[in-house]
Amino acid sequence: MSFKRPCPLARYNRTSYFYPTTFSESSEHSHLLVSPVLVASAVIGVVITLSCITIIVGSIRRDRQARIQRHHHRHRRHHHHHRHRRRRHREYASGGHTHSRSSPRMPYACSPAEDWPPPLDVSSEGDVDVTVLWELYPDSPPGYEECMGPGATQLYVPTDAPPPYSMTDSCPRLNGALDSDSGQSRSHRQQEQRTQGQSRLHTVSMDTLPPYEAVCGTGSPSDLLPLPGPEPWPSNSQGSPIPTQAPMPSPERIV
């Protein structure tokens, strides 16, 4: 019985045959694991790059549009201001210093910003441009003739003076009555002035006022109804009352 010894070359060939196969399979698995990571990294990098480029381009375009709109708005406002100034100068030269009621009114609050007049520019000396004031206030205030003249429409002036005083003759009589009564009420006025200085309240006493007869006169008829009661005593030239006999109460005076 004989045994055959295997050939070492064949064994070496077998081993050499199996080793390259195992190495090739492991390399294929490593390629399958590395390729998705590379693809994802490339996609993320491309997306980030495109986003940055879009943001930068959009900001530049927005700044350019804002600059163009600002320049256009400034140009339109400047042109609008000069047009209004020329129109105001023509109206001022043709119509004098008066402004008609048909002048354009102030724009509404919903109007765009370019329709509003320019802001009021006050210099350091306090001078104000007249044209700017004309644009802000197109209607001039009422004059003296409109308020106090014969055709006044802004203010009502009563034609009748309220009794018992008059608009023309009340001051001399009142001053004369106060001068005649100043000697008697001087002490009262001094006391009232001291009281007013302490309390700082403006009060008027009935003693300082002139009587009704001194202001209106004794001969002028009065439309006021007489009050029931004793008649006032007659006074002499010095101003002191003369005591007289009290009248008997009549049935008409009894209330």
UniProtKB/Swiss-Prot annotation:
Keywords, in A-Z order: Membrane, Transmembrane, Transmembrane helix
Compositional bias annotation for Low complexity: 217-226
Signal sequence coordinates: none
Chief location bin: membrane
A GO cellular-component term linked to this record: membrane
Compositional bias segments (type: Polar residues): 193-206, 234-243
Localization (cell): Membrane
Name listed for the protein in its UniProt record: Protein BEAN1
Gene source species: Mus musculus
Lineage of the species this protein comes from: Eukaryota, Metazoa, Chordata, Craniata, Vertebrata
